[in-house]
């Protein structure tokens, strides 16, 4: 490649921003396409604001630690949880793009006030996944999904959101790490963007990311070993005996999923004997991640059925999650269904 060609390629890459990519994906400039592009831009803005605050967290008062409150999930609320949730609301309240926002941090959806422009979409999100990592400066993330409102929701129950994961229009996450990355899908592949701080723009880094068919990584909180059902314990015993496997678990779903997408393997958050439904929420954690991974050629399951087929019965419903490379997920499923198969594992 000549110097000129390399220069042009670099310029083309720097000009392929998130909003431009969304419009290219939709192959349209109609009102719906413009709205989705604007939605993604607002999500990106929220990500930039959260990334900026995280980068200064150790230097600012009132950023680290707990608020003293407990959220709808029964979890202690971090100060950054509150900030991140408020950022998403502020980014969308005056946008005219959404009619409501539903979050891990709110018992009921936030409805756009009548004195503000109201759109036709719903944003579901986990504003700060893995927030327990903030105080020790490890990776955290934001997870999001976009759905279109169906019906009027006059009773404010958001019952139209209780549909399977195939109804998501878009899904993605923002990873706050050494660089800030935004990974998204509109159902046309999975694409990776990196925030260029000098431009203030998310620039395309990987188009049509493909997860390896199998991988050596298994990501699970083994501290729960004796709380699991026997099939999950048997799977973990199996990988302990096999050469080539490597355990990686950070406590932040976004960070662990990003590793699995890039390197292959499997992430598990199974149910326990006490809580068979597990910990992860379906609508704004598990389903968006499943959508992304399947668009990258991976597989997502509850262990007994495809994750995207699950229909929630309430907004904050939980689900077990097994997600990653197709061969690795199938192996875990085989233990749950009591038909163990031999995996293909890359040596490390």
UniProtKB/Swiss-Prot annotation:
CDD domains: FBPase. InterPro entries: FBPase_C_dom, FBPase_class-1, FBPase_N, FBPtase, Fructose_bisphosphatase_AS. Its EC number is 3.1.3.11. One of its GO terms (cellular component) is cytosol. Pfam families: FBPase, FBPase_C. It catalyses: beta-D-fructose 1,6-bisphosphate + H2O = beta-D-fructose 6-phosphate + phosphate. It is an enzyme of class 3 (hydrolase). Substrate binds at residues 129-132, 221, 249, 279. Mg(2+) 1 binds at residues 104, 126, 128. Binds 2 magnesium ions per subunit. One of its GO terms (biological process) is sucrose biosynthetic process. Belongs to the FBPase class 1 family. Homotetramer. This is Fructose-1,6-bisphosphatase class 1. It comes from Thermosynechococcus vestitus (strain NIES-2133 / IAM M-273 / BP-1). The gene is fbp.
């Amino acid at each position: 490649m000549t110097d000129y060609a390399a220069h042009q390629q670099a310029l083309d890459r720097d000009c392929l921003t998130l909003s431009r990519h969304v419009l290219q994906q939709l192959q349209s400039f109609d009102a719906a396409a413009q709205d989705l592009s604007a939605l993604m831009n607002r999500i990106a803005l929220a990500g930039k604001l959260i990334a900026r605050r995280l980068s200064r967290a150790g230097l600012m008062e009132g950023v680290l630690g707990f608020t003293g409150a407990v959220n709808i999930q029964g979890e202690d609320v971090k100060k950054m949880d509150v900030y991140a949730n408020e950022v998403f609301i502020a980014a969308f309240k005056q946008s005219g793009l959404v009619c409501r926002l539903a979050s891990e941090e709110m018992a009921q959806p936030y409805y756009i006030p009548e004195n503000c422009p109201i759109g036709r979409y719903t944003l579901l999100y986990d504003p700060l996944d893995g927030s327990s990592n903030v105080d020790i400066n490890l990776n955290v993330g934001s997870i999001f999904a976009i759905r279109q409102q169906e019906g009027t929701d006059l009773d404010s129950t958001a019952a139209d959101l209780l549909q399977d994961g195939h109804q998501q229009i878009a899904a993605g996450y923002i990873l706050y790490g050494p660089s800030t990355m935004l990974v998204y899908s509109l159902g046309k592949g999975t694409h990776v963007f990196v925030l260029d701080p000098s431009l203030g723009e998310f620039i395309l880094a990987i188009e049509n990311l493909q997860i390896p068919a199998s991988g050596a990584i298994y990501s699970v909180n083994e501290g729960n070993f004796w709380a699991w059902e026997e099939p999950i314990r048997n799977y973990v015993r199996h990988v302990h005996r096999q050469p080539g496997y490597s355990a990686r678990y950070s406590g932040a779903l976004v960070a662990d999923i990003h590793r699995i997408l890039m390197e292959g393997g499997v992430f598990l958050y199974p149910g326990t004997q006490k809580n068979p439904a597990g910990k992860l929420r379906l609508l704004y954690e598990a389903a968006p991640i499943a959508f992304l991974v399947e668009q990258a050629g991976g597989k997502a399951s509850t262990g007994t059925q495809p994750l995207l087929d699950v229909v929630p019965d309430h907004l904050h419903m939980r689900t077990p999650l097994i997600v990653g490379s197709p061969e690795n997920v199938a192996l875990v499923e085989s233990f749950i269904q009591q038909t163990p198969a031999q995996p293909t594992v890359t040596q490390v």
